[in-house]
Design a protein with these regions (language model features):
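Extreme N-terminal "head/tail" segments of very large remodeling/mechanoenzyme assemblies
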Residues: 1-106
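Extended, charged alpha-helical "arm/stalk" segments used for dimerization and assembly
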Residues: 26-29, 37, 82-159
Length: 159
């Protein structure tokens, strides 16, 4: 199991520079705010950091803050077992992805292969991760209205 520790980001969606969120202060975190305040952007940023895609299908060109338009940066720190991992993304015209384990660079030669390594470390696919990490009313309703077979399949996939 992984534990998300810290998320830092600059210029993603409606956010500017210098955002820092400690994710392991509590076992469950609820983000509350009015519409348009950036609540749903946080899990999307986490998905981008770990899987290079997001559950809303937002294109890469639409992720940078449109008022700054200077690319974006994401750093996500997480642990698995006794190891501390850090994923750093710097995207302007191209993407630079760096993966560290306990301070040592274990990135592959390409961003695609580095993301494959990240998924191997996490041990769950994108869909399962998104359903576990990001609960909104639609996602909760999907599980509740799913057939018994599909609910069972989802729960078995967690094991």
């Amino acid at each position: 199991m992984i534990t998300l520790k810290r998320l830092q980001w600059d210029n993603c969606f409606s956010y500017g520079e210098g955002n820092d969120l400690i994710l392991d202060d509590n076992s469950v975190t609820q983000i509350i705010g009015t519409n348009g305040m950036g609540k749903s952007s946080i899990p999307l940023i986490i998905e981008e950091a770990l899987y290079n895609k997001n559950s809303k299908g937002i294109k890469k060109a639409d992720i940078p803050n449109r008022y700054i338009n200077d690319g974006y940066k994401i750093v996500l720190t997480f642990t698995k077992d006794e190891d501390v991992y850090s994923v750093s993304i710097n995207r302007k015209t191209s993407i630079k992805v760096k993966l560290e384990r306990n301070g040592e660079d274990i990135s592959s030669h390409t961003a695609t292969n580095t993301y494959k390594t990240i998924q191997d470390i996490i041990g769950v696919d994108f869909k399962t991760f998104s359903q576990l990490v990001y609960q909104n009313t639609n996602a909760s309703l999907q599980f509740l209205t799913a057939t018994d077979t599909n609910r069972k399949k989802f729960l078995i996939d967690l094991l």
